[in-house]
C-alpha cells in the first residue's frame, strides 16, 4: 500500500515533469551533428496545486570557439481547470531573449491520468519571433511555428521514471526547417532517478531531425542534468 501511495503522488507530479517547491537546475547538452555544447542554469518554483514559474539562462560552446550566450527565458503555467481528478487543463506561456532578438510562446496542456503509473499530456503551442528573418522568397517575415507535443509519462518504480516526448513543428510562414521542409520532428527520451527529497538527476537522449544544410546528418543530442529541491 505504501508503494502504491508513492506511485500516486509521483504520477501527479510527473504529469507536469516537476516536484513541488523551489529548485535549482543545471544541465549540459552535446549535439553530435554540430559538435556544440550547451550549458543551462535554471531556477524555479512549483506550487502544490501544479502552478509554476522558472527562469532559464543558457550558453553554447563549439570546438575551437568561444563561449557564447544562448538565451534568457521566463516561463509560467497554471492548472486552470480540473473537471475530474484525472483530467487537468493547463495554459502556459514564456518570453525569451537572445542576441538576434526576442520571442515567446503560448501553449495549452491537457493531461489525463490513465493509471497510477501512466499519464499523458498533449500540448498545443504557438512559437513567435518578434524579429524578422529572410524567408524562401527573399522577403522579411517572422519565422513562427505551430507545435504539437506529447508527454508519455511512465512511473517505473517509486524512484525511477521515464518520459517519451515527441514534438511536431510546422512553420507558419515561408520558411524551411533544418531538414529542408516546412515541418520537422523532435523526439526526447528522458530518464529520471529520485535519489532523495533534494536530488533529482536525469539523462536525455534526443533526435532533432536531419540537418541538410550545414551538417548533412541526423541531429542527435545527449543531455545530462540534475535538479536540487530546497
Swiss-Prot record:
Top-level taxon in the UniProt lineage: Bacteria
Organism (species): Salmonella typhi
Bilayer topology: Multi-pass membrane protein
GO function terms (MF aspect): porin activity
Signal sequence interval, chain numbering: 1-20
One GO cellular component, as annotated: cell outer membrane
Upper lineage: Bacteria, Pseudomonadati, Pseudomonadota, Gammaproteobacteria, Enterobacterales
GO biological process: monoatomic ion transport; oligosaccharide transport
Protein name: Porin OmpL
Database matches in InterPro entries: Bact_OM_Channel_sf, Oligogalacturonate-sp_porin
Keywords assigned: Cell outer membrane, Ion transport, Membrane, Porin, Signal, Sugar transport, Transmembrane, Transmembrane beta strand, Transport
PANTHER family: N-ACETYLNEURAMINIC ACID OUTER MEMBRANE CHANNEL PROTEIN NANC-RELATED (PTHR38105:SF2), OUTER MEMBRANE PROTEIN-RELATED-RELATED (PTHR38105)
Purpose of the protein: Outer membrane channel protein that allows an efficient diffusion of low-molecular-weight solutes such as small sugars and tetraglycine. However, the specific substrate recognized by the OmpL channel is unknown.
Record Pfam families: KdgM (PF06178)
Similarity comment: family membership: Belongs to the oligogalacturonate-specific porin KdgM (TC 1.B.35) family. OmpL subfamily.
Subcellular localization(s) per the UniProt record: Cell outer membrane
Amino acid at each position: 500500500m505504501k508503494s502504491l501511495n508513492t506511485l500516486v503522488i509521483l504520477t501527479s507530479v510527473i504529469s507536469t515533469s516537476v516536484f513541488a517547491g523551489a529548485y535549482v537546475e543545471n544541465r549540459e547538452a552535446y549535439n553530435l551533428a554540430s559538435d556544440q555544447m550547451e550549458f543551462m542554469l535554471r531556477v524555479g518554483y512549483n506550487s502544490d496545486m501544479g502552478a509554476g514559474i522558472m527562469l532559464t539562462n543558457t550558453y553554447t560552446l563549439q570546438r575551437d570557439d568561444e563561449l557564447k550566450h544562448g538565451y534568457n527565458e521566463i516561463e509560467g503555467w497554471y492548472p486552470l481547470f480540473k473537471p475530474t481528478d484525472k483530467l487537468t487543463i493547463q495554459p502556459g506561456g514564456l518570453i525569451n531573449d537572445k542576441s538576434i532578438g526576442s520571442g515567446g510562446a503560448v501553449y495549452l496542456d491537457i493531461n489525463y491520468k490513465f493509471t497510477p503509473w501512466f499519464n499523458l499530456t498533449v500540448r498545443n503551442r504557438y512559437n513567435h519571433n518578434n524579429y524578422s528573418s529572410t524567408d524562401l522568397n527573399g522577403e522579411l517575415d517572422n519565422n513562427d511555428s505551430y507545435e504539437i507535443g506529447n508527454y508519455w509519462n511512465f512511473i517505473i518504480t517509486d524512484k525511477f521514471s521515464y518520459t517519451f516526448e515527441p514534438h511536431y513543428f510546422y512553420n507558419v510562414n515561408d520558411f524551411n526547417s533544418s531538414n529542408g521542409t516546412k515541418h520537422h520532428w523532435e523526439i526526447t527520451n528522458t530518464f529520471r532517478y529520485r535519489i532523495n527529497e533534494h536530488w533529482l538527476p536525469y539523462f536525455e537522449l534526443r533526435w532533432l531531425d536531419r540537418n541538410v544544410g550545414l551538417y548533412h546528418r541526423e541531429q542527435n543530442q545527449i543531455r545530462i542534468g540534475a535538479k536540487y529541491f530546497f
